[in-house]
């Protein structure tokens, strides 16, 4: 079993959306050896459910997110793969834990997009655009993890 964590600022918009989408794609592909989490680098939303905009877009696409609440990325977290939404989160993660054991990426490294950062829909209100960015990256991320961790699909 490998652990993957998506990380954004408050863990109410981008990273919980990515967690829910990734779980759905893993279910669709019948991959059971990847456990998905999400975390935030800021503590002001701890214990809160996903943002209303994230909930609406996930509901629109019939992707479950039951029981998800905001959690903080901590130095003691031990994930195999850490996927940040933007460079600021990469910097925050490295500051929180300068001795990371897991592999650290930005999500859009797994997309064909020119952008390198997933914009925060908390400020842009573009939840649909973020959904498209996350969805376009998840299968490539899954392919990478399956190969890197020598997992079986199906």
UniProtKB/Swiss-Prot annotation:
The active site is at 8 (nucleophile), 14, 120 (proton donor). Coiled coil: none annotated. GO terms for cellular component: extracellular region. Its EC number is 3.1.3.48. It comes from the Bacteria. Phosphorylations at Tyr-122 and Tyr-123 are essential for phosphatase activity. The keyword Phosphoprotein applies. GO terms for molecular function: protein tyrosine phosphatase activity. Disulfide bonds: none annotated. It is found in: Secreted. The keyword Phosphoprotein applies. Keywords: Hydrolase, Phosphoprotein, Protein phosphatase, Secreted. Secreted tyrosine phosphatase that plays a critical role during infection as a bacterial effector protein that counteracts host defenses. Required for intramacrophage survival. PANTHER family: LOW MOLECULAR WEIGHT PHOSPHOTYROSINE PROTEIN PHOSPHATASE (PTHR11717:SF7), LOW MOLECULAR WEIGHT PROTEIN TYROSINE PHOSPHATASE (PTHR11717). Belongs to the low molecular weight phosphotyrosine protein phosphatase family. Interacts with host CORO1A. This is Low molecular weight protein-tyrosine-phosphatase PtpA. The gene is ptpA.
